[in-house]
Curated annotation (Swiss-Prot):
GO MF term (any one): peroxidase activity
Protein name, per record: Hemoglobin subunit alpha-4
Tissue distribution of the protein: Red blood cells.
Gene3D superfamilies: Globins (1.10.490.10)
Positions of the Globin domain: 1-142
Positions bearing N-acetylserine: 1
Gene designation: hba4
GO biological process: hydrogen peroxide catabolic process
């Protein structure tokens, strides 16, 4: 679980991420689709899954907006993400492993954007937060 320090660390770095969240979301999603090409299967209905394409940009923004909402609900991620978990489990049928893959790609992009601010301590807190988020999204798969 997230300690008070973890929550403070996430909120601190999120304040820096937020102004660039559209770019970060698009780059993290683009990176995931290139490095883990099996994830493209979930987006076959898009006109293009190429990095920088309009659907990738749009979904990157959607993802980051949802994560932004989660930053404000760190004390109840499971409750907060119930409907989104149901959607991914029952309608979209996304393999929950992909939530961790996206989390990894987000960390890579955040580290590239904020090399000085993304200290090992911040990295640990962000990783714990994103893993909790991934776990909450996977809740309805059980």
């Amino acid at each position: 679980s997230l300690s008070a320090k973890d929550k403070a660390n996430v909120k601190a770095i999120w304040g820096k991420i937020l102004p660039k969240s559209d770019e970060i979301g698009e780059q993290a999603l683009s990176r995931m689709l290139v490095v883990y090409p099996q994830t493209k299967a979930y987006f076959s209905h898009w006109a293009s899954v190429a990095p920088g394409s309009a659907p990738v940009k749009k979904h990157g923004i959607t993802i980051m907006n949802q994560i932004d909402d989660c930053v404000g609900h760190m004390d109840d991620l499971f409750g907060f993400l119930t409907k989104l978990s149901e959607l991914h489990a029952t309608k979209l049928r996304v393999d929950p492993t992909n939530f961790k893959i996206l989390a990894h790609n987000l960390i890579v992009v955040i580290a590239a954007y904020f090399p000085a601010e993304f200290t090992p301590e911040i990295h640990l807190s962000v990783d714990k937060f994103l893993q909790q988020l991934a776990l909450a999204l996977a809740e309805k798969y059980r």
